[in-house]
């Protein structure tokens, strides 16, 4: 996998290559980009491992050196094709307000209904917790 990435394969091309090879993924179906990324970002590649939220290094011999691992991570990061989505949200507190009961982020909801007494469409915007009954 590492050699293919260094040769310029995209994650999709690598997944297709692995599907055509004899390498069988853990669940036995097709290779997914997410599972390939988990493997390529795992510190086990250079001999480290995660324990209680910390990365312990030098526990065993890795497949590549730590320097090569860091170069691989930079390469993967530089190849990412993510762009910030521009939003024209009317919810100014979106993802900023927390539920006072459970601490999860409040979601935004918008409803439009027709009010008969003055024959108008009324827009109602509000925030609610997904975990509230």
From Swiss-Prot:
Q: Where are the transmembrane segments?
A: none
What GO molecular-function term can you cite, just one? Answer: DNA binding
What are the DNA-binding region positions?
A: 1-82
Concerning PROSITE patterns, the annotation shows: RECOMBINASE_DNA_BIND
Family annotation (PANTHER family) = DNA-INVERTASE FROM LAMBDOID PROPHAGE (PTHR30461), SITE-SPECIFIC RECOMBINASE RESOLVASE FAMILY (PTHR30461:SF19)
Full protein name: Uncharacterized immunity region protein 5
- Source organism lineage? Viruses, Duplodnaviria, Heunggongvirae, Uroviricota, Caudoviricetes
């Amino acid at each position: 996998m590492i050699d293919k990435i260094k040769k310029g394969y995209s994650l999709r091309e690598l997944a297709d290559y692995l599907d055509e090879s004899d390498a069988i993924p853990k669940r036995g179906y097709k290779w997914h980009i997410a599972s390939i990324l988990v493997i390529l970002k795992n510190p086990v590649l250079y001999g480290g491992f995660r324990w209680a939220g910390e990365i312990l290094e030098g526990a065993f011999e890795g497949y590549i050196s730590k320097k090569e691992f860091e170069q691989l991570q930079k390469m993967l990061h530089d190849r990412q094709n993510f762009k910030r989505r521009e939003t024209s949200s009317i919810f100014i507190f979106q993802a900023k307000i927390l539920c006072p009961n459970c601490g999860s982020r409040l979601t935004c909801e918008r409803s439009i209904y027709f009010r008969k007494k003055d024959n108008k469409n009324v827009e109602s915007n509000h925030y609610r917790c997904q975990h509230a009954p």
